[in-house]
A protein has these predicted regions:
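Glycine- and Gly-Pro-enriched alpha-helical subdomains that act as flexible
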Residues: 239-258, 384-432
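C-terminal binding/interaction regions
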Residues: 269, 282-310, 428, 433-469
């Protein structure tokens, strides 16, 4: 242990030079400041390795002195602390980690100081130091950036606070006997249905179920770069397709199961044109979502009094990286599934290799299947769904349902020669047998069952191509 006390009357520059001289005899990679309360000289910053400091606010908000007073004066409901790399610009270095704490109505500066210290700094600072000790942090001093392996160093925040504002009170919740409301996250930069303006004045407001379905529909069509359309009912796709034109994509999506699409939510990933709008209003729909509309399309859509028309804006921004589900006593949080399938990474496990067309369809079906409730099965040809088996408690039942929907409800489509995607492994060969009976010729699934060999043997017996993700 070395103590380098500042002598009476000693200048800041002289004191920091003596600190550097003392440290020369040690091999170290990190300097941690705590309660130093002085701006470091440029000489110290240039000659010391990475230096960390903790600031009592969620930077870049409320930098400098009196952070707690600034927080209370601003009337915000959340503050916290920030561990950052020290740079020449005060409180502006790259952020390593942050910890949020709530602000209560009767708080004074002492209350806030204690809460930020004990609930924030005592959690965030050790976490940051541990990440450095584990070699998980890379600091680019020239670019003033920090990268942490796994974005969060492999850890979830020790505290998650919800800071949403009441956006609207709804007519009711999922059922008429339940009250309902929607809250808005003002920090969300991604296209979303909560902040989307409703363009047809006079139409009734969105319901709880409308919001739920609209969110699911929007998330599905964000998967695709080419013109895409989807129709959602009870948060499951009734159909989805990608095509050269938006109108063609909608037509193909609708014809998967027009019966189930009745009263559903339509999502489009291109500006809606008049041709597509004419198709949308040809049957009853609750909501249509798109990143813009032509004037001619709006003229068509707003003729329907109860069709809600939402403009979600550009779809190129993906800012939300976590999803969560409230449960009694807490909430489940997981990394958002933003991955796109890579056919080159598929593991072909059967004697027959999939064709290039089948690989393309596998990718499309796999992306669509992410938005189908499990147990989920998707039959697809080209880049359009043919039959969907959703939310079944056994996988073979989901296969049989997809086959039934394809045969009975699909218009001008057939499962003969189609590709099947399964959102989980097949525990037994019966799912493959049922798919073969429906005419399926290629399968994409995760694999991982103890009975994989039996399942692969069944696929080979039927002459199928099968790949594991």
């Amino acid at each position: 242990t070395e103590v380098v006390a500042r002598e009476e009357g000693e200048s800041r520059e002289s004191h920091e030079t003596r600190i550097l001289d003392t440290l020369e005899g040690y091999d170290f990679d990190l300097v941690c400041l705590d309660g130093y309360m002085r701006v470091l000289t440029d000489e110290f910053i240039d000659n010391a390795p990475t230096t960390l400091n903790v600031h009592p606010s969620l930077l870049p908000a409320f930098p400098g002195r009196d952070a707690h007073e600034q927080v209370l004066d601003a009337g915000v409901r959340m503050t916290g602390c920030t561990v950052h790399v020290v740079t020449e610009e005060v409180d502006a270095g790259p952020i390593v980690t942050q910890e949020a704490v709530p602000v209560y109505e009767d708080d004074d500066t002492d209350d806030l100081k204690q809460r930020v210290l004990y609930d924030g700094e005592f959690t965030a600072y050790p976490r940051a130091v541990r990440w450095f000790a584990e070699n998980r942090v890379s600091v680019d001093h020239e670019a003033e950036t920090v990268e942490i392996d796994g974005d969060t160093g492999g850890d979830f925040p020790h505290r998650r606070l919800i800071d949403d504002d009441l956006a609207d009170t709804l007519r009711y919740g999922e059922n008429p006997h339940q009250d309902g409301a929607v809250y808005a996250d003002g920090t969300c930069e991604e296209a979303n249905v909560v902040s989307a303006p409703q363009l047809n004045e006079g139409a009734k407001e969105l319901s709880y179920n409308n919001y739920n379905d609209a969110d699911g529909a929007l998330n599905l069509i964000k998967e695709f770069d080419e013109p895409a359309a989807a129709v959602i009912k009870h948060t499951n796709p009734a159909g989805c397709a990608v095509a050269d034109s938006l109108a063609d994509a909608y037509d193909r999506a609708l014809r998967t199961d027009a019966k189930s699409a009745f009263g559903g939510v339509v999502a489009l990933n291109r500006e809606c044109d008049a041709e597509t709008a004419e198709q949308v209003v040809d049957s009853f729909k609750e909501v249509v979502i798109a990143p813009g509309y032509t004037e001619a399309a709006l003229d068509v859509l707003t003729e329907k009094d109860n069709l809600r028309v939402l403009d979600v804006g550009e779809l190129d921004e993906i800012s939300e990286t976590m999803t969560e589900k409230p449960i009694v006593g807490g909430r489940l949080v997981q990394e958002r599934d933003l991955g796109s399938p890579d056919p080159e990474a598929f593991e072909v496990v059967t004697e027959r290799e999939p064709t290039d067309d089948e690989l393309e369809t596998m990718s499309f079906a796999w992306q669509t299947l992410k938005h189908v409730k499990s147990n989920g099965i998707a039959f697809a040809t080209g880049t359009e769904t043919v039959g969907l088996g959703v939310g079944q408690v056994s996988r073979v039942d989901a296969v049989e349902l997809a086959a039934k929907k394809a045969e009975r409800d699909a218009d001008g489509k057939s499962s003969e020669g189609a590709v099947m995607a399964s959102d989980a492994f097949f525990p037994f060969p019966d799912g493959i047998d049922a798919a073969a009976e429906a005419g399926i010729e290629a399968v994409i699934q995760p694999g991982g069952s103890v009975n994989d060999e039996d399942v692969i043997e069944a696929a080979d017996d039927h002459g199928m191509a099968m790949a594991f993700t």
